[in-house]
Curated annotation (Swiss-Prot):
Residues 93-134, 155-217 are annotated as: Disordered. It comes from Takifugu rubripes (Japanese pufferfish). This is Homeobox protein Hox-A11b. It holds the Pfam family DUF3528. Sequence-specific transcription factor which is part of a developmental regulatory system that provides cells with specific positional identities on the anterior-posterior axis. Residues 110-121 have a biased composition (Gly residues). The gene is hoxa11b.
Length: 284
């Protein structure tokens, strides 16, 4: 080929080739943007029949993600009809397509979940046509209903034991104040705090605990001071001195007698503690 020959604008220069190819040779092939799978077949080293049916890339890439498909992208929804709300509406016989399909799903799921313990989003209070064709949960196809059956079945089975446990807790809460009061009464009856406590304890034991326990009568500071002074002079008190103290302190003879008994027990315990202390520390 001579150098003086001019190349037309339709010719193509291939860097890996040493000759020019005329554009007229490619006139039989359509433009690559207008090609589809039928006009441009391709051979694969593997069997294409063994692969499942996969939707085209354009069908998946330009789904209803904020793109107006009516006037821009002309793609087929045949294989993905279960993904579009308006297709489901037309298929189930609804009057008109609504853009609030997402709100319907959300409201349906919230009202179904807020029902009873065994309720689920596919209950009877929703539109039967929509959820019956889509699935029990209102989003996934019907093939996934078996998983929701297992989940909701376990929750319904566990609802009855939970109710029984709640009833048992209520019964225990009702009975606990009475048992606590009875326990406190028994603990007070066995605590040797004062002389009146000992006397009333014996009375309650004799009557079998049917009669209510009397209220404690604490001694005043003046009464305790006079009783301690008398105990300092004589650990054991005779009957005459006991009657005199009872009249002076406005106490009964029994109260004075039991107070001296308790005071002697307390003194014995203090002496025992002192003995142990000095025995453990002989240098003191």
């Amino acid at each position: 080929m001579d150098f003086d020959e001019r190349i037309t604008a339709s010719n193509m220069y291939l860097p890996s080739c040493t000759y020019y190819v005329s554009g007229a040779d490619f006139s039989g092939l359509p433009h690559y943007l207008t090609q589809n799978q039928s006009t441009c077949p391709m051979t694969y080293p593997y069997q294409s029949t063994a692969l499942p049916q996969v939707p085209s890339v354009r069908d998946v890439a330009f789904r209803d993600y904020g793109i107006d498909t009516s006037n821009k992208w002309h793609h087929s929804r045949g294989s993905l009809s279960h993904c579009y709300t308006e297709d489901i509406v037309h298929r189930d016989g609804w009057t008109s397509p609504t853009p609030r399909g997402g709100e319907i799903l959300v409201k349906g799921s919230s009202s179904g979940g807020g029902g009873g313990g065994g309720g689920h989003p596919g209950s009877s209070n929703h539109t039967p046509g929509f959820y019956g064709s889509v699935g029990r949960n209102g989003v996934l196809p019907q093939a996934f209903d078996q998983f929701f059956d297992t989940a909701y079945g376990s929750s319904e089975g566990s609802a009855t034991p939970t109710a029984h446990a709640a009833d048992a807790d209520r019964q225990a809460a009702k009975t606990s104040p009475a048992s606590a009061q009875a326990g406190s009464d028994s603990a007070e009856s066995f605590s040797p705090k004062s002389s009146s406590g000992h006397s009333e304890e014996k009375q309650s034991r004799g009557s079998g605990g049917q009669r209510a326990r009397k209220k404690r009568c604490p001694y005043t500071k003046y009464q305790i001071r006079e009783l301690e002074r008398e105990f300092f002079f004589s650990v054991y008190i005779n009957k005459e001195k006991r009657l005199q103290l009872s009249r002076m302190l406005n106490l009964t003879d029994r109260q004075v007698k039991i107070w001296f008994q308790n005071r002697r027990m307390k003194e014995k315990k203090l002496n025992r503690d002192r003995l142990q202390y000095f025995t453990a520390n002989p240098l003191l």
